[in-house]
Amino acid sequence: DLTKKVTTEIEEQSVKRSIEVIRNRIDEFGVTEPEIVSQGKDRIVVQLPGVKDIERAKELIGKTAKLEFKMVNSDVSMQQINIWLDKAKKEGVEFNKGERFSKYVNAVNENLKNDLPVGNVLAFERKVNAKGEVTQLTPYLLSATANLTGDDLEDARVQFDQQQNQPQVGMNFKSRGAKIFGDITAENVGKLMAIVLDGNVYSAPRINGKIPNGRASITLGGQSYANQLKEAKDLALVLRAGALPVQLDFL
């Protein structure tokens, strides 16, 4: 059966590609002698000797979706966004512990599709504790279409501000991305651009001026130095490592 053969080959390639991406992420996570092997047709066993923060490791390994850069709609206040969310909640749409967060986000946008401005969607930045439980949700109203994607990004890395030696994330865009990024930053000085992964807002830095050469930096303010450095490392890793070809479910 040709269809079965093609499907099997696609599954095998997806597993192999996932192993490559996971290995890349784990290597950058700083684990010595990790073991990453396929088991059966659709399972990958990952062993990380010495890693104590399992939830953080899961979070970094399991980022699955396409990386997108989307403008935040600054014309709508947070007060208005919360009014919309309260409306959805009264109509039975709220996040229940244990369910997929993407299910909640999809339900919110479906419920509010006649209320939100045309061409906009709601997305959230999540803060989680050591147990992986959501402790804080920050809503953002975003452009429904991405201005840039991870395909436009050449590289991302941790670097340090020359004046105050604060950790930040440096990004280099490819030629196409550099042109688009230059135009976007010129037109949106003072506004926020969200970095979106798997439909979730990972960060929403402010555009401080036109960036014409495809090289940008993301500053991480309002935190301790240790937290800034951790966030810079995590964000650079997410930007650099790319997307997994399949959805991962942790067993």
Name what the model sees in each region.
Residues 212-251:
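Extended, hydrophilic extramembrane loops/domains of integral membrane proteins
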Residues 209:
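Conserved actuator
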Residues 1-206, 216:
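Non-transmembrane, solvent-exposed regions of membrane trafficking/translocation machinery
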